[in-house]
């Protein structure tokens, strides 16, 4: 939304000047200067105009109508975000259950049931490297190849798996949900800038290293970690909704494999010509809202009997 369009539109709302409008919505003069310099106005202002338009009987105005159309995706996102706290709680509880099962009780103290040290920060660092390796960053081979966006999204889910574990090591589930909730409201990019995506992913490693070396306090670094992670998701085109679906999917498929003989070697990984993870993603794509139990049941329906 352009600043000059805003000036035209607010007149249709009954405001005499831009100053009257910004005073009404409670922004500062420095905000206005920034909008004017960039000739761009934040999305939230478009949303306010949309709400005001609904309150008044207004004449037709092309600029105003275009602003309303622009802000509708945000309005839809905000409506969808009402379910995010529940989805976050489900993911954190599933992650805690998984960690309790694989690492034993009291894994939050930094050691698993075998006495092995747990280092979630190093896990994140390694997954970031795998994400970057899914892009054509190498100057010595495959220089013209395309980034594997599907695998990049999977790697982001793996990073999320370890980031949630790190957060749970430092705090409890309700506090974890509260910390994350405001960060996961964003619009995923449609045009992916691969170089920018790699740079944003590398910052996750920098934060992990800064915490590990004591340059950032452990708990204080969590907010920066969360913010940077969702920046990576946004620039990589991974919406929170799809992140949640993929996380539930991977968690559910791992449980399904264990329940059907994965450790014993009797598990069937290819289902009617397709690998189980491909089937899992196709099932997710047809589910508007995903829950662990519902997905598990659908995997049961698709699993070959022999």
Which ranges hold each PLM region?
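A short, Lys/Arg-rich alpha-helix, primarily the initiator
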Residues: 1-14, 77-80
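Secretory-pathway ectodomains
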Residues: 3-10, 24-27, 51-55
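Residue-level detector of alpha-helical secondary structure
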Residues: 7, 36, 49, 53, ...
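Short acidic alpha-helix initiation/capping motifs at coil-to-helix transition points
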Residues: 12, 27, 221-225
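Short alpha-helical DNA-recognition segment
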Residues: 15-34
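DNA major-groove recognition helix of helix-turn-helix/homeodomain DNA-binding modules
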Residues: 40-61
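Short, charged recognition helix plus adjacent turn
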Residues: 56-80
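Flexible "arm" and connector segments at domain edges
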Residues: 76-306
